[in-house]
C-alpha cells in the first residue's frame, strides 16, 4: 500500500471513530432518519423516555401510568410527532411505537422510545418543510439529530426545540 493511501485511510478511520453515533442515549436529545422514496415518506425516531415523560423507569404512581398511557395513545397518529405540509396530501400508512416501558419490562437504567412511521404522499414535491409539534408537549426534549435522504439528496441537521422545523 502506498504511503498516501495509508495516510488517507488512517485519516478516514480517525474521523469515523470521532463522529458520535445516532444510537447514543443522551437526555433531551433524539435522532430521526427521514427517507423519501418516490411517494413514500418513512421515518425512524429514537428519543429517551426521560425526555418525553420525565422518567425512564416503569411507572410508580397513577400519574406516571396516566402519562405513559397518554403518550402511547398520542403516538398512534404520527402528526403528534411530525407535521407535514398540507399541499403534500400525505396519508398515514403505519406507525409503530416501541419501548421496554410500554411492555412493562424493567430496563437497565435507560429506556428509549423507538418510533417508526410511514406516509404515502400524492404530491411529494410539496414536502419542503417539516414541523415537530411534540416539542411543545415535551419540554425536556431539546433537539433532534436529523438525517434526510431522498432521491439524489442527503442532508443532516440539528432541529432544536426553539426552532422546531426542518427544510430539506
Task: Briefly describe each language-model feature range.
Residues 1-5:
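N-terminal secretory signal peptides that target proteins for export/translocation
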Amino acid at each position: 500500500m502506498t504511503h498516501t493511501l495509508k495516510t488517507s485511510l488512517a485519516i478516514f478511520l480517525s474521523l469515523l471513530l470521532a463522529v458520535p453515533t445516532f444510537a447514543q442515549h443522551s437526555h433531551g436529545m433524539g435522532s430521526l432518519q427521514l427517507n423519501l422514496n418516490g411517494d413514500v415518506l418513512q421515518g425512524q425516531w429514537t428519543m429517551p423516555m426521560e425526555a418525553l415523560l420525565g422518567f425512564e423507569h416503569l411507572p410508580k404512581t397513577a400519574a406516571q401510568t396516566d402519562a405513559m398511557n397518554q403518550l402511547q395513545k398520542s403516538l398512534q397518529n404520527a402528526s403528534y410527532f411530525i407535521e407535514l405540509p398540507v399541499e403534500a396530501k400525505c396519508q398515514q400508512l403505519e406507525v409503530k411505537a416501541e419501548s421496554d416501558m410500554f411492555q412493562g419490562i424493567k430496563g437497565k437504567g435507560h429506556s428509549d422510545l423507538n418510533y417508526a412511521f410511514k406516509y404515502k404522499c400524492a404530491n411529494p414535491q410539496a414536502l419542503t418543510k417539516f414541523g415537530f409539534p411534540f416539542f411543545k408537549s415535551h419540554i425536556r426534549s431539546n433537539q433532534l439529530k436529523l438525517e434526510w435522504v431522498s432521491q439524489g439528496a442527503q442532508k443532516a441537521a440539528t432541529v432544536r426545540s426553539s426552532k422546531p422545523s426542518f427544510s430539506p
